[in-house]
Regions:
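Catalytic-site neighborhoods of secreted/periplasmic enzymes
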Residues: 1-90
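A short beta-strand-to-alpha-helix junction
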Residues: 2-6, 165-177, 219-228, 241-258, ...
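Histidine-centered active-site microenvironments of extracellular/periplasmic hydrolases
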Residues: 129-144, 188-252, 288
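C-terminal, low-complexity/hydrophilic appendages and adjacent surface loops
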Residues: 225, 296-399, 435
């Protein structure tokens, strides 16, 4: 969740006289662990029924009947809601993606002549399950003839070639649906002549492994570039002369906050580490040398745009690792009493505005290791360096002591910039004395 001390860009826009509206089917925002995000906007709309959304109230569903058409690997306790939800999603207009973009059209029809507004259209698709209307699925024929298989579990690939092709075809179908409805949004921009005074950003949160590196999904395995390198497309009327150009500067999602705040004429908080993208849009001016990313408890990763360095702790043990929060909720649940019983207060970080936080032991798996979102142990957890210029698929780690030392030093600098707790440096073996 957003912490009390977190800077929220829609909240800052709202407090400076702007208006923010979000349209989403992203049901995680309405669970424990996400419930402080959507209320930062002036108004919000949610479309129900995506994936495992707790949507329909059926006390005794006939799961034997409902699940009989699904691949056995797809029948898990947590997919129950999805199977129930699909019994109510029969026609294209029942899917959340068309509904979301329809609501976006409604917002634009009402507000296109107004000024100083932000519309966030957050579509859960093409997230799993890769369930799309039949007309999109027909565009990607394959030889698979089994039960419905459009939700691969986060695990190593051990499916047949036909099953793999089926999952990928379903992914292609749902992506095509998103593409078509995004195109309808662009048509609405044409219809309302919004290109003259309205900026548009297209991006996402993460990628997904569809068998690359012999994995499905995310979270458990290393953060390969298929997961970390995400699309970013920006239109702004001030830079329309540069339309269609590619940019090569290294950027991160954190750069969107200062960028959007700058466009609204709102001051950028001092805690912000992202950089405005205005100069990137204008002339592809570099705004950072490196970007740091990763999963809590796993590797700390860094890239300079060419090399990607994934540095794991020597031991994945959760000993000496802590979580810091004033909002003790996890993904879909509250912290348990057992998790909080030994909590202590930790001094403020440089981003908490002078406020202390609870210091809590992290989740552990049965082996005492920090766990991946309650999914178990991190896998393939060894440090590696890739040269993505010569090896864009990250198939073969390289040895280059000079590059590794440079990126380790930059990782240390970045962690200091973000005021990472001391135990992180020790855990990763990059204490200052290393240099």
């Amino acid at each position: 969740p957003l912490e009390p001390f977190d800077n929220s860009f829609p909240d800052l826009i709202k407090s400076n006289g702007g208006y923010g509206h979000i349209i989403t089917d992203h049901y995680h925002y309405f669970h424990d662990g996400g419930a402080t995000y959507h209320t930062r906007y002036n108004s919000w709309e949610i479309v129900r029924g995506a994936s495992t959304d707790d949507w329909k109230g059926i006390v005794e569903p006939n799961m034997e009947k409902i699940s009989k058409n699904y691949h056995k690997k797809q029948i898990r306790p947590f997919t129950k809601n999805d199977m129930i939800n699909r019994t109510y999603i029969n026609n294209e207009e029942d899917f959340s993606c068309p509904q979301i973009f329809g609501l976006a059209d409604d917002f634009l029809d009402v507000n296109s002549k107004a000024d100083n507004w932000l519309l966030q259209i957050e579509n859960f698709d093409p997230h799993e399950p890769f369930y799309a209307p039949t007309r999109f699925r027909k565009e990607y024929p394959c030889s698979y003839e089994g039960a419905v298989f459009d939700w691969p579990m986060y695990d190593r690939v051990d499916e047949t070639s036909e099953e793999i092709a089926e999952v990928r075809a379903n992914y292609a179908a749902i992506t095509s649906m998103c593409d078509e409805y995004f195109g309808k949004l662009l048509d609405k921009f044409d219809e309302l002549d919004l290109w003259e005074d309205t900026a548009l950003i297209l991006t996402t949160d993460h990628g997904f492994l569809l068998g690359e590196h012999e994995w499905w999904g995310k979270n458990l395995m290393p953060v390969y570039d298929e997961l970390a390198r995400i699309p970013l497309m920006i239109y702004h009327p001030d830079y329309n002369k540069n339309g269609g150009e590619m940019r090569h500067s290294l950027t991160q999602v954190t750069d969107l906050t200062p960028t959007v705040l700058e466009w609204f004429g709102v001051g950028i908080p001092s805690e912000t580490t992202g950089k405005s993208l205005s100069q990137v849009l204008e002339k592809d001016q570099k705004i950072r040398d490196t970007a740091i990313y990763g999963y809590f408890g796993a590797a700390c990763n860094i890239t300079d745009g060419r090399y990607t360095y994934l540095r794991y702790p020597k031991k994945l043990s959760a000993d000496g690792l802590y979580e810091y929060t004033l909002m003790p909720t996890r993904f879909g649940r509250r912290f348990s009493i057992e998790e909080l019983i030994d909590a202590t207060l930790s001094p403020p970080f440089n981003f908490t505005k002078g406020v202390p936080t609870l210091k809590v032991y992290p989740m552990k798996n049965k082996d005492g290791e920090a766990s991946a979102m309650e999914m178990g142990a991190f896998q393939d957890a060894f440090t590696r360096l890739y040269d993505t210029k010569s090896d864009p698929k990250q198939a073969s780690p390289i040895t280059n002591n000079e590059v590794e030392a440079r990126l380790c030093k930059e990782m240390h600098r970045q962690l200091l910039l973000h005021d990472a707790p001391n135990e992180i440096f020790k855990r990763l073996g990059i204490e200052e004395s290393t240099y």
